[in-house]
């Protein structure tokens, strides 16, 4: 039996971003179809939606109220790229709560790792701001639950999305209980994530990749910069912001990674916290490369490649 579960709920497909938006339900449908095509039948975790208390550990009350009101009353979006409608409120609570439920399952020993295949994504959402397709910061909500509720002292977040996770950095920049490490394209949206930004007691790390660099640079940066930092930090739990938009065919990035590179990155970091890993889907907008990269990532988590 697989030791790696997934998180998925059909309700998140109802988060309607319109016919031309890159972050659509077709992304998740493509991933699940690829799992079926590869004859992968992972266990699906039962989850609970995030509570207001869960969200308040990361987000301001004003932000939470604004998102709820915008969704329920169909108001003008706070950010033009970040579309939301009536079903978006439930989807966002399930995406954030699913990350917490995944962490619970790993801590309880039910699974070694969990891959959350949900939407909307989260790493651009700041404590008081929705942006970049993200309403709430799913991985930050999970990390704050791990340190505030469970009482872990050191949680690591590895973000390999082609875009810098400005929201995650902002949430934990002054909190040494969470080490945020991002490798991302620069210059690129959202224009953040600089190497000199090291956070409290050097628990923030940004590695910038110029557009079009050889994919080998990604792997050497992980081996020579991120892994030594994580080993020094000795995390008790690893969270991964799994964005697949650094793939060579992704329309929102200009990098050269392929499916096997996401598996290689996953294998490089997955053991850093004794094998306790929860991965949360972020970006990836070419449906075929997103789907195949997600399969490779899952198989690496499950020790199959």
Where are these regions (language model features)?
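N-terminal low-complexity, Ser/Thr- and acidic-residue-enriched intrinsically disordered segments
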Residues: 1-57
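A general "terminal functional-core" signal
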Residues: 2-6, 13, 37, 65-305
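Charged, often glycine-rich, active-site loop that binds/positions anionic groups
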Residues: 48-72
């Amino acid at each position: 039996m697989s030791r790696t579960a997934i998180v998925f709920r059909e309700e998140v497909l109802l988060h309607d971003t319109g016919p031309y938006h890159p972050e659509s339900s077709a992304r998740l449908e493509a991933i699940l179809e690829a799992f079926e095509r590869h004859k992968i039948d992972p266990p699906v975790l039962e989850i609970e939606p995030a509570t207001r208390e869960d969200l308040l550990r990361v987000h301001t009350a004003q932000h939470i109220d604004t998102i709820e009101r915008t969704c329920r009353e169909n108001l003008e979006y706070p950010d033009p790229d970040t579309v939301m409608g009536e079903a978006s409120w439930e989807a966002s609570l399930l995406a954030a709560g699913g990350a917490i439920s995944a962490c619970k399952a790993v801590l309880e020993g039910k699974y070694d790792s969990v891959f959350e295949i949900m939407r909307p994504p989260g790493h651009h959402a700041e404590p008081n701001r929705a942006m970049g397709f993200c309403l709430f910061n799913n991985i930050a909500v999970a990390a704050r639950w791990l340190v505030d509720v469970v009482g872990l002292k050191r949680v690591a977040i590895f973000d390999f999305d082609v875009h810098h996770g400005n929201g995650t950095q902002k949430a934990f920049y002054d909190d040494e209980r969470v080490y945020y490490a991002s490798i991302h394209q620069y210059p690129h949206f959202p224009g953040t994530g600089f190497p000199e930004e090291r956070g409290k007691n050097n628990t923030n790390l940004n590695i910038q990749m110029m557009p079009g660099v050889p994919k080998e640079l990604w792997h050497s940066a992980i081996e020579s910069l991120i892994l030594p930092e994580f080993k020094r930090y000795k995390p008790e739990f690893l969270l991964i912001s799994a964005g697949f938009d650094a793939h060579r065919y992704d329309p929102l990035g200009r990098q050269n990674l392929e499916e096997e590179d996401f598996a290689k990155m996953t294998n490089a970091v997955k053991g850093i916290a004794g094998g306790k890993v929860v991965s949360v889907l972020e970006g990836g907008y070419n449906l075929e490369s997103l789907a195949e990269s997600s399969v490779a990532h899952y198989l690496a988590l499950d020790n199959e490649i």
